[in-house]
UniProtKB/Swiss-Prot annotation:
The keyword Membrane does not apply. It comes from Triticum aestivum (Wheat). Binds to the 23S rRNA. PROSITE patterns: RIBOSOMAL_L9. It holds the Pfam family Ribosomal_L9_N. One of its GO terms (biological process) is translation. One of its GO terms (cellular component) is chloroplast. The gene is RPL9. This is Large ribosomal subunit protein bL9c. Residues 1-35 form a transit peptide. Belongs to the bacterial ribosomal protein bL9 family. It is found in: Plastid, Chloroplast. Gene3D superfamilies: Ribosomal protein L9, C-terminal domain (3.10.430.100), Ribosomal protein L9, N-terminal domain (3.40.5.10). SUPFAM superfamilies: L9 N-domain-like, Ribosomal protein L9 C-domain.
Amino acid sequence: MASPSCASTLPWTAAAFSYPRRLQTRRAPSLVIVAQGRVKKYRQVILKDDIDEISGKKGDTMKVRAGFYRNFLLPKGKATLLTPDVLKEMQLEQERIEAEKKRVKEEAQQLARVFETIGAFKVPRKGGKGKQIFGSVTAQDLVDIIKSQLNRDVDKRLVEVPEIREVGEYVAEIKLHPDVTAKVRLTVYTK
């Protein structure tokens, strides 16, 4: 057996562990994980641009995969998520656009009534023998007459004039709106 003096020098002897020590352990802070349930695979989005990949046009609401939205549409700024606030804003914008379209159509109808109540625009031309005139009456001629008599600007591309090469009465059409076409009477005479 070992001598008592020896026992005090060896750390592994029973003398070194005569009283039980409490082991100190440090605990890491606990991380609480809460399950979110199933992740939505699709997202409702409003397109800001025309997108060929999904055959969508600006302003359309579409259902797209979450990854496509997160990785392609969102970084490029081509779509926003459809939320109740965005939906309400979109409806207000749609109502404003519809009111503007209605106002433009009413103005076009009013202008068409003005053109039809005027009677006939008189177009002077230099004439030849009989009913023949020199040159022809073009859309630009009609636009100039309307501007001088009514102080209204009309785009000549919207005016459809039949081929006029003789003195007489003619009817021209002015497309003021996709739904409104005004018929204008022309009286061509020689000077």
